[in-house]
Amino acid sequence: MASGNAHIGKPAPDFTATAVVDGAFKEVKLSDYRGKYVVLFFYPLDFTFVCPTEIIAFSNHAEDFRKLGCEVLGVSVDSQFTHLAWINTPRKEGGLGPLNIPLLADVTRSLSENYGVLKTDEGIAYRGLFIIDAKGILRQITVNDLPVGRSVDEALRLVQAFQYTDEHGEVCPAGWKPGSDTIKPNVDDSKEYFSKHN
């Protein structure tokens, strides 16, 4: 795995890529999403096994993300033509069916390399997930090895947590969910949280 140019707290590397959006080819730029949160997830290959479970799960929750002012983008090293063929394959046959999220083509592998998820010996991407805030700043990175899929619920929770901290200036403890207690980030005020939870 290459180190890439994606660093927490820094601007996310911009990109332009051809994507399949609503069954058609479209040029997509990260900068087009400025003002919104973005969940950018990489997956190894089309027509595989774990990948469709993740893509369909993200697609099924696309509206939940949009309600938070967040868009979801999927990326693999496959071409837009392969993406479209997979989308046009019925789910019962291992295809994706219609999607509510764009799938970006990274045939040059520049996105995967720039984001540090390229598995160079195979030329495919690890399962990287990046949360980018409305200002284009990278807030979260996770990278899974190939055989284990990611949790859409956890990605939603993380977006909600970062948005909460942005708005309220408080910090979110382990396992925080909307409506749960948060911590005021100073020594004296934080005792209010710790006295309730210990």
Curated annotation (Swiss-Prot):
Classification via CDD domains: PRX_Typ2cys
InterPro entries in UniProt: AhpC/TSA, Peroxiredoxin, Peroxiredoxin_AhpC-typ, Peroxiredoxin_C, Thioredoxin-like_sf, Thioredoxin_domain
Catalytic activity: a hydroperoxide + [thioredoxin]-dithiol = an alcohol + [thioredoxin]-disulfide + H2O
Subcellular location: Cytoplasm
Domain Thioredoxin: from-to ranges: 6-164
UniProt keyword list: Acetylation, Antioxidant, Cytoplasm, Disulfide bond, Oxidoreductase, Peroxidase, Phosphoprotein, Redox-active center
GO cellular component term, pick one: cytosol
Residues carrying N6-acetyllysine: 196
Modification Phosphoserine, positions: 112
GO molecular function, one term: thioredoxin peroxidase activity
Family: Belongs to the peroxiredoxin family. AhpC/Prx1 subfamily.
Additional information: The active site is a conserved redox-active cysteine residue, the peroxidatic cysteine (C(P)), which makes the nucleophilic attack on the peroxide substrate. The peroxide oxidizes the C(P)-SH to cysteine sulfenic acid (C(P)-SOH), which then reacts with another cysteine residue, the resolving cysteine (C(R)), to form a disulfide bridge. The disulfide is subsequently reduced by an appropriate electron donor to complete the catalytic cycle. In this typical 2-Cys peroxiredoxin, C(R) is provided by the other dimeric subunit to form an intersubunit disulfide.
PANTHER family recorded: PEROXIREDOXIN-2, THIOREDOXIN PEROXIDASE
Function: Thiol-specific peroxidase that catalyzes the reduction of hydrogen peroxide and organic hydroperoxides to water and alcohols, respectively. Plays a role in cell protection against oxidative stress by detoxifying peroxides and as sensor of hydrogen peroxide-mediated signaling events. Might participate in the signaling cascades of growth factors and tumor necrosis factor-alpha by regulating the intracellular concentrations of H(2)O(2).
Subunit structure: Homodimer; disulfide-linked, upon oxidation. 5 homodimers assemble to form a ring-like decamer. Interacts with TIPIN.
Protein name: Peroxiredoxin-2
